[in-house]
Amino acid sequence: MASSRAQWFNPIAFTPWPVTCITTIVYLALLIPILVINLVVPSAPETNPKGVNLTEAWRDLQHLTGGFHPYNSRRNDEVHEWLLSRINSIIRPTVEAGQPSSANDNLPEVFVFDDNRSNLTYSNGGVGKTSIVGVYFESTNIIVYIRGSEDGLENWWEHSNGKPKGKGGVLVNAHYDSVSTGYGATDDGIGVVSLLQLLRYFTTPGNNPRKGLVLLFNNGEEDYLNGAHPPEADTTQAQDDTRHTNIDSLWHMLSASIGTTEGLVSYTGMDFDGKSKDQNKVNSGTGTLGVWFDMFGTAFAVFRLHTLFAISVALLVIAPLVIFVTSVILSKTDRMYLFSMSKSLEGTGDQVSLRGLRGFSRTPIILVIATTIPICLAYLLEKVNPYIVHSSQFSVWSMMFSAWIFLAWFLACAADFFRPSALHRAYSYTWIFIATWIMLVINTVYANQKGIAAGPSTAEFPGAAGEDTDPTESTSLLRGQRTTFANYRSSRPGGAAETDEREDINKGGTFEHEQSWSWTLPRWTWVLQLLLLAPIVLILVGQLALFLTASMCQVGSDGVSTFVVYLACSVFTTLLCIPLFPLIHRFTYHIPTFLFLVFIGTLIYNLVAFPFSPANRLKTFFIQEVDLDNGSNTVSLTGIQPYLTDAINSIPSAAGQNITCDKTTPFGKLERCSWSGLSPNVLGQGRERDNEIDPDKWITYNITKTVGKNKARIEISGRNTRACKLKFDRAVANFQVSGSAVDHRMPPTSRQGVSEIRLWSRTWENTWVVDINWHESADKSDDDDDDHDDENHDAPQNILSGKAICMWSDGNQPGVIPALDEVRLYAPSWIAISKAADGLVEASHSFTIQ
C-alpha cells in the first residue's frame, strides 16, 4: 500500500494530474514567448547607441510622411531635395572627397551621387503568348558611397571605362516614394530613415566599414517598377503614417539593419568575391544556399543548405537503424512487447496473452478524424463568413486549436476506456516517427533537387525504446523479477484473457485496466519525450504558423480565396498538437472541457461577427477615368461583395445612379463597380493660367506614320504630370523611346509583342517620342477558302488602334480629385482606400493608325 501511495503522489508519474499540469506548463512556457515575440515590438533603448540618433530618426520619419509622395507628385520632388539636404548635413563633419583633413583622418570618404541622368527601358517579360508591358523610366535615385578600408583609393567612376578595384562591397536599398494613397511610414519610410542612420553610424569614428558600403535611395518602386505587394492592408492606405507606428518599430528595423550591415561590411571571407555564375550580374561570388530560423527573437540559427542535406541523409539512415537495433536488443533480452500477441510458456507450450497489438491502429485513425474537423471548420468559415480571419485571426486559431484537442482527447479516452493499453504512447511515437521519416525523405529530395529547405528536418521520436525500457537490465517486463515465461500462469489455448485480479494489479502500480505487466515500466520517461519533441515543434512550427497567418490573413481583400488561409491554419494546428497526442489520453477532463467551451464560443463568434473594423479595414481600390473624346467621367471602386456595395451606397454622388458592377478584374473574387463621379481638377487648385484649359487639352499627342510600313512615331505629353502610357488593342512588335538606354540584360520586348508602354519622366510635362512598329494582323488567314464572306477580311490588316493616356497621382491638395475626397469622407470607417492603378486619375484619347 505504501508503494501505491508513493506512486500516486509521484509528481512526474504518467498519471492524469501530472500529465495535465506538466504538459500545460510546457506548452504555455513555449507558446507565450512565441506570441510575445511575434506581437510585441522590442522597446527602443533609453539612450542612443554610438553612432545612432533615434530622436533624429523619428523626426525624419515624421517629415518624410508629412504627405503622399508617389513618384508622380510634387511632394516627391520635395522629399528628394530634403533627402539630399539631410545626407549632406550628416556627412558634413566627415572628410570631403579628395580633401583630407588631419582632424578627420579616421573618418571614411563619402560620395553622394544625385542620379538625374540615367534611364532604362525594360519589360515584365510576359508569360506564354501573353503580350508584355514595356516601361521607360527616368531615375531620380540618390546613391551614397562610403569608401571601405579595403577599397581602392581611385575614383574609378570619373573615368569612362573605369572599374572598381578591391573586394566586393555591400548594397543597402530603400525606396523613398509612397503609394498615392498612403503616407509610406512602413513602406518604406522606416527603411529610408534607417539608411540615413546607417550613414550616420558608419561615418562615426570607430565604425568605419571594411568593405565599401553603398546606400541606395531609389524612387518609383511603388509604381510597377519593382512590384512590391505588401501583405498588410494598411501599408497602401492613409493609416501608414507615424500615428500608427512608433519609435519602437523604428528601432526594431534600425537595429536589425545596423547589425546585419555591420556584419556584411566586416566580413573577411571570400564567399562574396569572385565572378558570378551569371555573367549578366555583378561579380559578387557564387554564394551558397542557406537555411535559417529564429530563436525566440534573440538569435538566428544559420547554416548551409548542403549541411541540412547531409544531416537529413544521416538521420534517414541512422534513425531507422537505431530503432532496429533497439528492437533487436529488447527482443533478445525478453523485453520486447510491441507487436507481440502472446508468449509461449517454457516447457508447457501454453500461450500467455500479452495484448501487444492493442492500440496499434488508434493513432492514425484518431489523428485523421481530429485533423478532418479543422479542415471542415475551414470549409464552413469559407462558406459562411470567409473574411473573419481579416480581423480575428486568433479567434480562428483558438477555434481550431480547441476543437482539435477536445476531439483528440475524447476519442483517445474512449479508445483507452474500451481497450486500455499501456502502449498507446509507444505506438503514437512510432506512427509519428514513420510520418516524420517520410516527410524528411520528401524534404531531402527537395533540398537536393530544388534547393528548397522546408518541412521537418529532424527524425527523432525513438518510438518503443523509451516505452519499453525496464528499471534494470535483469527485470522482465511481464512480472516480478522473472527472466523467462516458465513460471507464468497459463491461459486458455484460444485466448487470452488474463486471470489476475484487478485489485492486485492496482496495488502493483498499473493504471486502471492496462496490462498487468505495465507496473514495471518507468513512470518518468514521458517527461523526457515531451521535452524533446514539444520545443522543437513549437519553436519552428509555431513561429512559422504565426508568420503565415499574419502575412496572409488579409489577402481576402485582394481577391484571394481565404480557404487557403483556413486550410493552412488547420494543418498547422495538427502539427502544433502532435507533441500532445501520445499523452492526451492521460489528461483530466478539466482542460478539454474548458477548450470545448472555448470552441463553442469562438465558433459562434467566427460565424456571426462582422469581419472588418476601423483597426482592420477592408481594402478597396480607387480609380477615376476620364474619356477626353466624349467627356465621360467614371469613378470606380474595386473590392469584395457585398461590402463594396455597402461602401458605395454611403457616397452622396453615387446616390440614385445606376451602379454597374462586373467581375472583369484580374483579381479573383473582386468586383469593380462604377458610376459617374465628380469631375477632377488635375491641373491643380490655384493655377489660374490653367483654370480655363478644356479637359481635352490635358493631353497632347501627335502620330506620324511611315508611308508603306507598319511603323509610326507617337509624341505624347500631359499637363501637370510626368507619367503617361500608350495602350494598344493588339500588341506592337517593338518600341523605342527617344533618348532611351537599353540594357541587353533586360530586353524591352519579346516575340509576344508589347500591348502597353508606360512612360515615366523626371521632368514635369515632358514630351515623350516613341517609335513603334507592328506586324500585320494574324486574323487574315486560314478562312480565305471559306464559302461565306466575312467583312472583316476586307478590312485593312495593318490598322493599329489604341489609347493615349496620362495619369495624375497627387492627392495631397483637397479639391484636385473631388471624387477621391468624397470617398474618403463618406465611406464607412472600416473601408480603406488604395490605388487601383499607377494613377488615381487617368485621362485618355483614342487613336487609330492606318
UniProtKB/Swiss-Prot annotation:
Its cofactor is Zn(2+). GO terms for cellular component: vacuolar membrane. Its main location: membrane. It is an enzyme of class 3 (hydrolase). Keywords: Glycoprotein, Hydrolase, Membrane, Metal-binding, Metalloprotease, Protease, Transmembrane, Transmembrane helix, Vacuole, Zinc. Zn(2+) 1 binds at H175, D187. InterPro entries: M28_fam, Peptidase_M28, PFF1_C, PFF1_TM. It is found in: Vacuole membrane. Zn(2+) 2 binds at D187, E222. SUPFAM superfamilies: Zn-dependent exopeptidases. The active site is at E221. Its EC number is 3.4.-.-. Pfam families: Peptidase_M28, PFF1_C, PFF1_TM. Residues 42-282, 330-363, 415-425, 551-563, 612-850 are vacuolar. One of its GO terms (molecular function) is metalloexopeptidase activity. GO terms for biological process: proteolysis. Residues 1-20, 304-308, 385-393, 447-529, 585-590 are cytoplasmic. Binds 2 Zn(2+) ions per subunit. The chain crosses the membrane at residues 21-41, 283-303, 309-329, 364-384, 394-414, 426-446, 530-550, 564-584, 591-611. It is a multi-pass membrane protein. Glycans are attached at N53, N116, N119, N630, N658, N702. Belongs to the peptidase M28 family. May be involved in vacuolar sorting and osmoregulation. This is Vacuolar membrane protease. It comes from Ajellomyces capsulatus (strain NAm1 / WU24) (Darling's disease fungus).
